[in-house]
């Protein structure tokens, strides 16, 4: 089956697609920060949807409020990880901006892999979260160490955490690129009539 969404400009077609993707991963394909998902002048927002997967019905809900942690519920039961949503609702989002994967820098390609792997592998999503958390702690330590030199004694702990979670991230990204090369290579050969070979390196 195919559903086609039509409407005038600024009626919310893209917002609807963004909402579906957000309910599948708790990651927005457009917004850089969750606060951008809340309407201007408002302090909170929520989104919910019914989904049918694994021969049963699911109710997916996410609530955001300024200054508070988001709430994710599956069938009214709170869950901690956004990756739990992808076990129920999988989504692939494609838009014209995806062409920037080729034209933009490495950051755009890393985000592409992060968005895909966070849906495919819960362990990757956890490692990515752990890495960012350790990085933020380390940044604060370095920033405040001039006033509190003893903070530098805690750096090795966060270096270790970043190394451990970073190793998991690198492992999954490398495997992802191997599979991407395999499947994208087949599609590229068909598009080029067998005259070109696509290469993917990480």
Where on the chain are the PLM-derived regions?
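Regular, well-ordered alpha-helical segments
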Residues: 22-25, 140
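Short, conserved catalytic or interaction motifs in soluble domains
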Residues: 7, 25, 193
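Pre-Walker A-like glycine/lysine-rich segment at the N-terminus of P-loop NTPase domains
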Residues: 1-22
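Short hydrophobic/aromatic segments of transmembrane alpha-helices and their interfaces
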Residues: 19-20, 90-93, 159
């Amino acid at each position: 089956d195919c559903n086609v969404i039509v409407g005038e400009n600024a009626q919310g077609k893209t917002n609807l697609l963004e909402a579906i993707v957000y309910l599948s991963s708790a990651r927005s394909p457009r917004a850089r920060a969750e606060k951008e998902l809340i309407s201007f002048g408002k302090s909170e927002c929520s989104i919910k949807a019914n989904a049918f997967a694994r021969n049963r019905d699911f109710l997916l809900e996410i609530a955001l409020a300024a200054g508070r942690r988001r709430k994710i519920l599956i069938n009214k039961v709170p869950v901690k990880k956004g990756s739990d949503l992808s076990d129920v609702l999988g989504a692939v989002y494609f838009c014209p901006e995806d062409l920037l994967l080729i034209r933009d820098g490495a950051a755009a390609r890393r985000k592409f892999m992060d968005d895909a792997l966070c849906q495919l592998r819960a362990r990757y999503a956890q490692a990515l979260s752990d890495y960012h958390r350790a990085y933020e702690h380390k940044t604060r330590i370095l920033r405040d160490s001039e006033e509190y030199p003893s903070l530098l004694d805690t750096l090795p702990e966060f270096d270790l955490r970043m190394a451990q979670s970073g190793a998991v991230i690198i492992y999954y990204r490398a495997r992802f690129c191997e599979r991407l090369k395999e499947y994208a290579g087949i599609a590229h050969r068909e598009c080029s009539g067998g005259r070109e070979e696509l290469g993917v390196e990480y």
